[in-house]
Every structure is written in C-alpha cells, then in structure tokens.
Amino acid sequence: SSYPARIQTALKLLKKNADKYLSPEGLQKYGPKFLQILKNLQNSDYPGLHLIYSQFRTLEGVGILSLILEQNGFARLKISKLSGIWALAMDDEDIGKPVFALYTGTETAEEKEVTRNIFNGTWDSLPAPLADQLRRIAANNNMGEIVKVLMITSSGSEGITLKNTRY
C-alpha cells in the first residue's frame, strides 16, 4: 500500500489503542518527549496560551500530538461555516475542556484567520454570530479561556501576529 495509506492506518491503530499508547503511562515508554509536552500543558505553573510548532503535520508531529491531547482530556476547536456564517461546532461534552486548535496547511486561509482571531481573543475581528457565541463562554482568550493551545506547522510560522502567548 502507499505511504499515505500506511500513515492513515498507523493513526487509526494509535487512536484505537489510545489507552495503551497515548496515556501518560504509554507515553512514558513510547513517547517521553510527547509526555513532557503534555505535562507542560497541564502544569498550573504555566498558565495562559501555549504555542506548539512542528514541521510535521501527521505522524511525528501535530497529528499524533492531537491524538495525545484528545486522549488526555483536551478537545479540538471545531468551527464550521454554514450558509456563509461561521459558528462554533464543538460537541456539548467538549465545552469546558481545555481546547487546542490547528493552524496548518490543511485549513483554508479564511478558517486559519478565524482560528487565529479566536486564539488572540479579538472577538471584534470575527463575524458577529461567532463573536456572540464566544462572548457567552468568555470575555476574551487572554488565559486560554476558549483555546489554550495553538499548534502550527511551517504554514503558520511566518507573518502572523499572536497575542498573549506565554509558552
């Protein structure tokens, strides 16, 4: 099979066996660097917004780290555009969890800009319906009230302004 197909198979197997491989115990054995990242994100000594850069979108980087975060109590930011209107598309059970967002080469330019403005807490730069949804959750995102972690790849590494990022 092709390399991309093998990557998808590996990610599916990781997700299926998340308890074994992506728990803190599994990471201690199979991914100690990922475990340290998880500990840093969960450490109350490091409050506020976190930025994670990786050259890798799938296996070695953002893809696996996304699975690790989901396995360990984080939720992925989900936004959608229906009939031209941007809105949060988070599952009810994910509200209140720490949230991570992706800023990579797989999102549209518009989606990346909306994500960046959510991370920055610049509600006035967002479409009014989405801004109203966010204001009902928090006044801003200065300390990660909406999105705690932004994961970027090289597509997000140049020419963007991020506010209040501490780690």
Where are these regions (language model features)?
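Active-site helix-initiating loop/hinge in glycosyltransferases
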Residues: 61, 159-161
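Conserved Helicase C-terminal RecA-like lobe
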Residues: 1-149
